[in-house]
Amino acid sequence: MTVKKLYFVPAGRCMLDHSSVNSTLTPGELLDLPVWCYLLETEEGPILVDTGMPESAVNNEGLFNGTFVEGQVLPKMTEEDRIVNILKRVGYEPEDLLYIISSHLHFDHAGGNGAFINTPIIVQRAEYEAAQHSEEYLKECILPNLNYKIIEGDYEVVPGVQLLHTPGHTPGHQSLLIETEKSGPVLLTIDASYTKENFENEVPFAGFDSELALSSIKRLKEVVMKEKPIVFFGHDIEQERGCKVFPEYI
């Protein structure tokens, strides 16, 4: 079975210090990076990968003032970038979705999770537990009483949608290998690799455990050798320029 359509859905932008994308650089220059959600249309129903930024980031570039990342992370989010508004533009309401897949629980990937009261939210146990106790996770990204589906390790969500446990950027990060009708296999590294440079040249970037992150990149390289997928990175400005976005699909 394959995924009928894979949509790239823009979900705002984020200014991030370039040293977060390349740890060998001296902090002080901000990059304007894309924030993505991904919509999968499958035989079983629609699946959303990541939910963008939280409502607290709307028109609030100073969201992280007074924190350890002040001046290094500046969200650029409008009302239109709220996940409920994004879904409306693509023809869905929150209750229509079969699953939410949280690649990890950082603010630009899980900020909209609270819009999904009943929809199962698939997240790695290591990520769920880390988010309970670390200041780098916003409360909007780890709300209680949501319908969390806790998994451990690799996991097939539906036929054609495989989660790959790729820790390092965070303790429980997961990437996706998707078999699409139109384009064949597609690998979404998400934040296991921000950019092509991180992936191909193994340039270090921001994360919880740099050695673990490198191990995950090496693992994904093995997947690429075996499956020959199209590879999309988490926040690659160069790749964004040629990316097909909704209503186009791959």
Curated annotation (Swiss-Prot):
Entry's Gene Ontology molecular function annotations: acyl-L-homoserine-lactone lactonohydrolase activity; metal ion binding
pH dependence, record text: Optimum pH is 8.0 with 3-oxo-C8-HSL as substrate. Activity increases with increase in pH from 6.0 to 8.0, and declines slightly at pH 9.0. Little or no activity at pH 5.0 or below.
Residue positions binding Zn(2+) 2: D108, H109, D191, H235
Domain of life, source organism: Bacteria
CDD domains: AHL_lactonase_MBL-fold
Effect caused by changing H169S: Results in a conformational change. Reduces activity on N-beta-oxooctanoyl-L-homoserine lactone by 38.6%. Reduces activity on acyl homoserine lactone by 47% and decreases enzyme affinity
Presence of the UniProt keyword Repeat in the record: no
Pfam families: Lactamase_B
InterPro entries: AHLLactAiiA (IPR054870), MBL_superfamily_lactonases (IPR051013), Metallo-B-lactamas (IPR001279), RibonucZ/Hydroxyglut_hydro (IPR036866)
Keyword DNA damage included in the entry's annotation: no
Activity regulation (record text): Completely inhibited by Cu(2+) and Ag(+). Partially inhibited by Cr(2+), Pb(2+) and Fe(2+). Mg(2+), Ca(2+), Mn(2+), Co(2+), Ni(2+), Zn(2+) and Cd(2+) have no effect on activity. The chelating agents EDTA, 2,2'bipyridine and o-phenanthroline have no effect on enzyme activity.
Catalyzed reactions per annotation: an N-acyl-L-homoserine lactone + H2O = an N-acyl-L-homoserine + H(+)
Temperature dependence of activity: Stable below 37 degrees Celsius, activity decreases sharply after incubation for 2 hours at 45 degrees Celsius.
Binding residues annotated for Zn(2+) 1, in chain numbering: H104, H106, H169, D191
NCBIfam families reported in the protein's UniProt record: AHLLactAiiA (NF045699)
Role this protein plays: Hydrolyzes acyl homoserine lactones with varying lengths of acyl chains, with a slight preference for substrates without 3-oxo substitution at the C3 position. Has only residual activity towards non-acyl lactones, and no activity towards non-cyclic esters.
Family note: Belongs to the metallo-beta-lactamase superfamily.
Protein name listed in UniProt: N-acyl homoserine lactonase
Native species: Bacillus sp
